[in-house]
Amino acid sequence: MEQFHATTIFAVQHNGSVAMAGDGQVTFGNSMVMKHGAKKVRRLYRGEVLAGFAGSVADAITLFEKFEGKLEEYHGNLQRAAVELAKEWRMDKILRRLEAMMIVANKEHLLLISGNGEIIEPDDGILAIGSGGSFALAAGRALKTYAPHLGAREIAEASLRTAAEICVFTNNNLVVDELN
């Protein structure tokens, strides 16, 4: 059975801010664009956490709900909520089959929660996932290094626009959000 998938999510910590950007394309299989304006970046826990997903849409929504529940349970502690979600993800037979990845961030931490329950905090404050993730990551690293005067939001938007120019599964209908 074909699934709805393909997207790019990019996040960066820079100059005291964190920004996250996601495109709006939802693809059915490898041949049909079903939606151009999906919102894959959201605020969670009283607006203090940014979260973005890539992968199967239904699976990602399930993970959003689970992660939001963990944030509430652990009073907004991003790292603890991520660890507890990862534990549950690895142990639960149904969750283990979910095909999605998430980037979550608050002002202090930026984390990747992978499809196999791994949690990764980048050394350089930049993460990208999805079909255009490699392109966005390369652009973001270059901008953060060689254009440090840009803000986190500008880096996130430019990185995702670069990915959209290259990746057929990424479009220019961006949602960009920032925590200062």
Curated annotation (Swiss-Prot):
Gene3D superfamilies named among the record's database cross-references: Glutamine Phosphoribosylpyrophosphate, subunit 1, domain 1 (3.60.20.10)
Superkingdom assignment: Bacteria
Inhibition and activation profile: Allosterically activated by HslU binding.
Keyword Amino-acid biosynthesis: no
Any Gene Ontology biological process: proteolysis involved in protein catabolic process
Signal sequence segment: none
Enzyme class per UniProt: hydrolase
GO MF term (any one): threonine-type endopeptidase activity
Pfam family, one: Proteasome
NCBIfam families, A to Z: ATP_dep_HslV, PRK05456.1
HAMAP family for this protein: HslV
Job description of the protein: Protease subunit of a proteasome-like degradation complex believed to be a general protein degrading machinery.
Protein name per the record: ATP-dependent protease subunit HslV
UniProt organism field: Brevibacillus brevis (strain 47 / JCM 6285 / NBRC 100599)
Gene: hslV
